[in-house]
Amino acid sequence: MPPTVIAEPVASGAHASYSGGPGETDYHALNAMLNLYDADGKIQFDKDREAAHQYFLQHVNQNTVFFHNQDEKLDYLIRENYYEREVLDQYSRNFVKTLLDRAYAKKFRFPTFLGAFKYYTSYTLKTFDGKRYLERFEDRVVMVALTLAAGDTALAELLVDEIIDGRFQPATPTFLNSGKKQRGEPVSCFLLRVEDNMESIGRSINSALQLSKRGGGVALLLTNIREHGAPIKNIENQSSGVIPIMKLLEDAFSYANQLGARQGAGAVYLHAHHPDIYRFLDTKRENADEKIRIKTLSLGVVIPDITFELAKRNDDMYLFSPYDVERVYGVPFADISVTEKYYEMVDDARIRKTKIKAREFFQTLAELQFESGYPYIMFEDTVNRANPIDGKITHSNLCSEILQVSTPSLFNEDLSYAKVGKDISCNLGSLNIAKTMDSPDFAQTIEVAIRALTAVSDQTHIKSVPSIEQGNNDSHAIGLGQMNLHGYLARERIFYGSDEGIDFTNIYFYTVLYHALRASNRIAIERGTHFKGFERSKYASGEFFDKYTDQIWEPKTQKVRQLFADAGIRIPTQDDWRRLKESVQAHGIYNQNLQAVPPTGSISYINHSTSSIHPIVSKVEIRKEGKIGRVYYPAPYMTNDNLEYYEDAYEIGYEKIIDTYAAATQHVDQGLSLTLFFKDTATTRDVNKAQIYAWRKGIKTLYYIRLRQMALEGTEVEGCVSCML
């Protein structure tokens, strides 16, 4: 007998104080009142809390399947193929029930309507017809903890505490899929290389289909593809260039989505010195011919230092045939340092080249970003100088924060692998900075997060794309992110981008890095192994640690010194770093990559955080949510008494945002999704100035450009949801 739908006791999910009665205001109307000032000109925060309360009473409780007890519920969910039996079989039933009790005892409440709405719309387990709810937030947290802890009861308990107390939030694919029988992979996104042959192109399209089906966004490197008009088998003017491959990929992504749950999403990256660069960029023009227009793929451009230097001198910039470069140097174009070899390639008559004006190239970039928000930018030399791993980073991902080394695969004629290369998958999750600063044990919070993300890597086996599986097995790479920086700073009455704000960002990321490395070192010691290639890394040589052992890192402002002291968080000393360096050189670290800061989307609403580490876009954010229409979301910790600290990103301006990201970047081995915000008075010159400022400040990548302009609302595109946390 299936269970009946009866309202669960209100206390298990909403507020226990509800007495019922006619005439209640609809939750949607209550939420809308957040956007209206009251008679005294105050923001009505209480209306949003009431909306969350009424959402449970009017909707959630009435549509939640009722069970008499936990045993009945667990038995039903396993029997009916809702839960993965294998996950629960790793524990005694008694432990699972105790863990559920532990979660429910926390008396979790969604502080905002949008948080509750997002959770029930997008994450919770529903009946197969999609009409009724089978889980509360606590149940989802417990299933995620049980899945990631893989039988380790102590870790499962710690994970429940970290997630339900809001300190650690796994990325959408992990939080959505863990423990469910019908599910996608827990991985956020993937990066593939495409080499200059039909086998690699064909295999890449198949890989894109396979990965998109499993729920990840996929970014592909097209830099190595020979340009339009290049020879094929020595016959001139034969190659079609990169555009037809982009068209094939666009169709593949629209076909393959994760059980209809998320639109397939793809990105393609091309080097600035590829001869097809203008054709590539033109695909995003509003007036582009339909034959070449690319509507749903995201574009990224890889720019080396030399391009900026040429523009500074107002010189021409040469574009080099990847086909010729590979013939001359014996390695694919993407694996060459263009900055290093630029003049050598200019002088080499064997390499075909064309020239464009360097400043015109940057002007074109800015025009396009005005029109479409694209392309993303990866500063190639900055990225590779900061890379502690042996090898070259050639491109980034759908949200421009993953920066890992990849190697090419070689194929036989039948498309089987002659040599499996190394491609990239991103195992993501983020810390809420405010809650982490409030943690009873800061070091433990970081360690539990690192262990959770390592579990995502350990449990992922994507056999349909051997290069992704190989990369994951070799590297155990993860990306610990951060969110709620602006929320935390405002709570502590610090302005975003101020000296104190930048000082805090620097010391916080510095301290997180220390504990993340220490946790990875511990895992390496426990397991008696490290990531493949560790001995060729800057961790093994000790070079990575020099900047931490050679100078003192401490707060420059009294305010930040006090924040860490009041929180009881010890800031690592040079001696701490020396000891860690010794242990790492002796035993290694388990994870090749540890940190990456993604553009947290849905999970920051559930977790009640400001997104990533950029400023808020408005004090009360307006979102369009499916059938319900407009929904309003208040910035975390905002009250009518501290509004001055909630200046929005457009008012703050790009310099303070870049300065803040630069402070964090120096302690993050991968990238940070950095969106630039401009007022509608901005010109393409302003965009170029911001790009140059970011490059000079050591920023690794730039994500979207957003203009405060009604016509451009929505340039963020659904695309990044798959990599957004």
Curated annotation (Swiss-Prot):
Catalytic-site annotation from UniProt: N397, C399, E401
Keywords: Allosteric enzyme, ATP-binding, Deoxyribonucleotide synthesis, Disulfide bond, Nucleotide-binding, Oxidoreductase
Disulfide bonds: C189-C426
Function: Provides the precursors necessary for DNA synthesis. Catalyzes the biosynthesis of deoxyribonucleotides from the corresponding ribonucleotides. When coexpressed in E.coli with nrdF2 the 2 proteins complement a temperature-sensitive E.coli mutant, however coexpression with nrdF1 does not complement.
Protein name as annotated: Ribonucleoside-diphosphate reductase subunit alpha
Induction (record text): Initially decreases as oxygen levels drop, then rises again.
GO CC entries: plasma membrane; ribonucleoside-diphosphate reductase complex
Source organism superkingdom: Bacteria
Site (Allosteric effector binding): D196, R226
InterPro entries: NrdE_NrdA_C (IPR013346), RNR_1b_NrdE (IPR026459), RNR_lg_C (IPR000788), RNR_lsu_N (IPR013509), RNR_N (IPR013554), RNR_R1-su_N (IPR008926), Rrm1 (IPR039718)
Residues flagged as site, Important for hydrogen atom transfer: C189, C426
Coiled coil, from the record: none
Similarity annotation: Belongs to the ribonucleoside diphosphate reductase large chain family.
GO biological process, any: DNA replication
Quaternary structure (record): Tetramer of two alpha and two beta subunits. Co-immunoprecipitates with DarG in the presence and absence of darT.
Known catalytic reactions: a 2'-deoxyribonucleoside 5'-diphosphate + [thioredoxin]-disulfide + H2O = a ribonucleoside 5'-diphosphate + [thioredoxin]-dithiol
EC number(s) reported in the record: 1.17.4.1
Site, Important for electron transfer: residue positions: Y703, Y704
Enzyme class (EC, first level): oxidoreductase
GO molecular function, one term: ATP binding
Chain positions of site Interacts with thioredoxin/glutaredoxin: C720, C723
